[in-house]
Amino acid sequence: MGHSAVLLSVALVILPACVTGGPVQRQQQHKLLLVSFDGFRWNYDQDVETPNLDSMAQEGVKARYMTPAFVTMTSPCHFTLVTGKYIENHGVVHNMFYNTTNKVRLPYHATLGIQRWWDNGSIPIWITAQRQGLKTGSFFYPGGNVTYQGEAVTMSRKEGVLHNYKNETEWRANVDTVMKWFTEEDVSLVTLYFGEPDSTGHKYGPESQERKDMVKQVDRTVGYLRDSIKRHHLTDSLNLIITSDHGMTTVNKKASDLVEFHKFPNFTFRDIEFELLDYGPNGMLIPKEGMLEKVYSVLKDAHPRLHVYKKEDFPKTFHYANNPRITSLLMYSDLGYVIHGRVNVQFNSGEHGFDNQDMDMKTIFRAVGPSFKAGLEVEPFESVHVYELMCQLLGIVPEPNDGHPGVLQPMLRSGSPLSRQHHLVVVLMGILTGLAKVV
């Protein structure tokens, strides 16, 4: 056996032991808090005074903006953050659970508790960290209160159906609880979710005074959070990331702007076996047997602002359609236009779900802590890379994912610790790549 073949054999023996997910011995790692403020558009801090977000950027890292995954919905984008996968690869393709066979469709809050919707093959960072010896927590974060391959998050809280997302007093109480998890329960990773400014942006629109006032509340909460970190003596041991799932745009409401299926010439719902419409700018359809070509030909030019595709023709750049849960026809509309189905039931002033390349869908990224450089502004990046960064901060070996560990590496101070196991996997993967070319 040649020298290269021997090295390859050794690498193949060692590598599986490094990625089995079992507990590993590591140096003391810093803790990590990931905070998401739902629907915080990338430029919401430009028309409102945000002293706490500003000071966080001065003391840490700020991205010009972050590009979310498509489709720009809450649950799919949040799951991308904790799996590092594009939505077609992690399978949480919509805010709503749906079953195309029995026609069941469940709203967002009910879907949060549907285990099989989330546990469909991808392992989120909570479970990966726990399998490598850490405790984790999820406070209201989408996907954090179900089990994955039978394993639950160490500490978790889920909001109720009628939860008031605007209560600032409760926000502070939630921060207090998370601080206790870190200090009293020795949790290493927590994901903390706030439903604003998304709810306010939907109701009043992203350019409204109400949205601006809510951003001020968000900023006050960031200040309270950072003060809490200091009070609990976590400044030197806790890395903090503040981000979001997507942005928000103003809905066009003139009669000439409406995308209304029930008014399309030659279209009839009698040709449709399953529909998922009336959810912002996104839609899915399954025509009845033998009707696919007819329905497609009617819809593809039905409205200049509507883009209808057969599943196999959906733009690959979205990384969305290649999943068994995606229907035979799917569609999205241009920025500001929402899709109405049988009747008009959407009356939001603000909406998301649009093309993730539209600037109004971009969102924020801030980070501060012992592992991050100070006063650094980085170029825009995709949210799919955040998972690799978090694994690196925790010193854990990531699951297979679509991100790249080098993209966000420049944010980190030189000498920020990687676990030995993480280093070994990177080295061995390099060996395997090189040797595969010569063996």
Curated annotation (Swiss-Prot):
Task: Report the active site residues.
Answer: T74
This chain's function reads: Choline-specific phosphodiesterase that hydrolyzes sphingomyelin (SM) releasing the ceramide and phosphocholine and therefore is involved in sphingomyelin digestion, ceramide formation, and fatty acid (FA) absorption in the gastrointestinal tract. Also has phospholipase C activity and can also cleave phosphocholine from palmitoyl lyso-phosphatidylcholine and platelet-activating factor (PAF) leading to its inactivation. Does not have nucleotide pyrophosphatase activity.
* Coiled-coil portions: none
Q: What is its main location?
A: membrane
Species assigned in the record: Rattus norvegicus (Rat)
Single Gene Ontology BP term?
negative regulation of cell population proliferation
Region of interest: Required for enzyme activity: 71-77
Give UniProt keywords alphabetically.
Cell membrane, Glycoprotein, Hydrolase, Lipid metabolism, Membrane, Metal-binding, Signal, Transmembrane, Transmembrane helix, Zinc
GO CC annotation terms, alphabetical: Golgi apparatus; microvillus; plasma membrane
Signal sequence range: 1-21
Q: In which tissues is it expressed?
A: Detected in small intestine (at protein level). Highly expressed in the jejunum.
- This protein is called Ectonucleotide pyrophosphatase/phosphodiesterase family member 7
How is this chain's activity regulated?
Answer: platelet-activating factor hydrolysis is inhibited by higher amount of sphingomyelin. The hydrolysis of platelet-activating factor and sphingomyelin can be inhibited by the presence of sphingomyelin and platelet-activating factor respectively, the inhibition of platelet-activating factor hydrolysis by sphingomyelin being stronger. PAF hydrolysis is dose-dependently increased by both taurocholate (TC) and taurodeoxycholate (TDC). Hydrolase activity against PAF is inhibited by EDTA and stimulated by 0.1-0.25 mM Zn2+.
Question: Could you describe the post-translational modifications of this protein?
Answer: N-glycosylated; required for activity and transport to the plasma membrane.
Q: Membrane-spanning residues where?
A: 423-439
- Which parts of the sequence bind Zn(2+) 2? D198, H202, H352
| Compartments, as annotated in UniProt | Cell membrane
